Amino acid sequence: MKKLLYLGLLSVCVLLGSCVEKNVFNAFDKVERYMDVYSDSALLLLEQIPHPEKLRGKQRADYVLLLTQARDKNYLDSMQSDSLIKLAVDYYKNGGDNVKAGKALFYYGKVMDLQGNDTLAMQAYLNALAKLEKTEEYKLQGLAYEYIGILNADRKLHKDALDNYQSSVYCFQKAADTLGVIYAYRDIARIYYVEQQYDSVYNYINRALSLCEEKKGCIDFERVTPSLLQVKGIAKRNEGDLENAIILLKTAVETEQDRHSMHHCSMSLGNIYLNQNKLDEAKRYFTLALKSERPRTLAGAYHYLYLLEKRQKKYAMALYFKEKSDSLLSVDLDAKQASQILTLQRKYEKGKLLLEKQQVEHEKKIQFYFGMVIVLFIILL
């Protein structure tokens, strides 16, 4: 009778475990369906899963991958922690699911990028592409190429960046991802802007704007339009077409939803007015940039206000703005140096742990060989 009772209880536990596992996977399926269209709902569903710390194996890996993806799509700073996504990378790296392995590596690359570790970010993106190249995940391949291009552009490797962006366009086109194509066109235009090839800038920006026009009324396409106008506007400014530059940059400032981009655009516009000696208009747009929360942007705004006050021979105010600008640049430099020191410290700690591990293994080998000698000595006796 007791045996039957134990078997019954065991069966109930197995069934309950099976139901819980099934419910979790059902929740994951729903999250994946929501991710691209309703990313906020996807994040909410993940946060409602009870006791995620108790998940193990595939469930744990799937959970942290989806959570990292949802946080990224909702622009949350909590994505900057690499401890979660590393679990997914380690789980999938030797498995047969190249899509999830590639996706985990891609998001690990983004986390490394946010932490300022360009080398690890680049390696992660390249490893992601290696996993994805035989799959049909063209959109993810396009994103990986785009982020590799951004890293190369930051390193002034413009030719490499252009090649990466062109590969990105090809992948987005295969994925029928028009928005991805638009962002890649903008990236290409920015490279040509740096190279001062303005005809090519206008070519790619106009192609991107035409695609936006085809999707008029769609919020994602309306969101990218101001940044396209900004690139075109500063190119017009550099060519001396100030009338069209002002029209384009004004429209960009008025329609830009991203505050950081809007503040940069307002400084570009203010600089044109400063050079035209339209000081009231210049001050208006420089002051707008003072609402930024980023030290480097604020430093730029204060620097332009310093130039403006200096031109009006208001030296006391000019000196005040100059000191504010220098102070913010110093804070930004200190933060970068602190980040570099932290990176070096982590490398040192990792190297130290590796050395300790090697020493332990060496001691184990010595103990093993010593034991063998003792055994042989006893046998020979």
Residues of each region from the PLM?
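Hydrophobic positions within repeat-based interaction scaffolds
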Residues: 25-43, 51, 79-82, 280, ...
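TPR-repeat structural position
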Residues: 39, 77-78, 98, 118, ...
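Amphipathic alpha-helical segments of tetratricopeptide repeats
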Residues: 47-52, 86-93, 127-136, 167-171, ...
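N-terminal leader/linker segments that initiate helical-solenoid repeat arrays
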Residues: 19-82, 99
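Residue signature of alpha-solenoid helical repeat architecture, marking inter-repeat boundaries
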Residues: 21, 56-61, 99, 139, ...
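TPR/Sel1-like alpha-solenoid repeat signature
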Residues: 64, 101-112, 124, 131, ...
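Structural motif corresponding to the intra-repeat A-B loop/turn of tetratricopeptide repeats
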Residues: 74-75, 95, 108, 115, ...
